[in-house]
Amino acid sequence: MEVRNNNKVNLCFSFDNLRNELSRPYGILFINNKIFLEFISKSIQRGSRIITVGDYVSRVLEENGIVPFLEVIDGKTKRTITQNRAITRNKEYKVTNEAGKIRFEIFEIMENILKDREGGVVFVDGEEDLLVIPVTLSANHGDIVIYGQPNAGAVVIIVNEMIRWRVRDILEKAIVKEC
């Protein structure tokens, strides 16, 4: 086990063994943008915070006048570099996360960011896809977590104890490896 000089353990959860399970949507799959945007607008009116994981879903909301409380992006859509963002935020964070993994430290980072009342943008050097897991575990009850389902639409997770249980179940099946 490698310990960095900043006293953080260099371990990751690896999900290679869970590709099939993770390819299914873990929330409500919206295939119609109009219905999706109406749902998000009503959720905001009810006081839910909107958290996006992925460049495409973040951009769709922004283009429709909805600025998420927190965006987790890596600058790519389907592994292709996306255009620069039009909206800047007061708080911007940078993290590193390898494809197909979640670094242990990301859980604490997301928890701290989601405690902040201002939200912001998390720029991921690497890949953000699996960061739905720590975001969902750290989000408040009733928060809305959105991620893209490639070639299908947007998946909306309404955070509650049942979904946290499902996410913990996935996490327990992951393999711990050195990053």
Curated annotation (Swiss-Prot):
Signal peptide, first to last residue: none
Q: What molecular function terms (GO) are annotated for this protein?
A: GTP binding; kinase activity
Protein's name according to its UniProt entry: GTP-dependent dephospho-CoA kinase
Cite a single GO BP annotation.
Answer: coenzyme A biosynthetic process
Q: Which residues bind GTP?
A: D55, V57, D74, K76, E128
* Record InterPro entries: GTP-dep_dephospho-CoA_kin
Q: Does the keyword Disulfide bond apply?
A: no
Query: What is the enzyme's class at the highest EC level?
Result: transferase
Q: State its role.
A: Catalyzes the GTP-dependent phosphorylation of the 3'-hydroxyl group of dephosphocoenzyme A to form coenzyme A (CoA).
Enumerate the catalysed reactions: 3'-dephospho-CoA + GTP = GDP + CoA + H(+)
**Pathway assignment:** Cofactor biosynthesis; coenzyme A biosynthesis
The record ties this protein, via Pfam families, to: DUF359
Which family does the entry's similarity section mention?
Answer: Belongs to the GTP-dependent DPCK family.
Keywords, alphabetical: Coenzyme A biosynthesis, GTP-binding, Kinase, Nucleotide-binding, Transferase
What's its EC?
2.7.1.237
Q: Tell me the lineage of the source organism.
A: Archaea, Thermoproteota, Thermoprotei, Sulfolobales, Sulfolobaceae
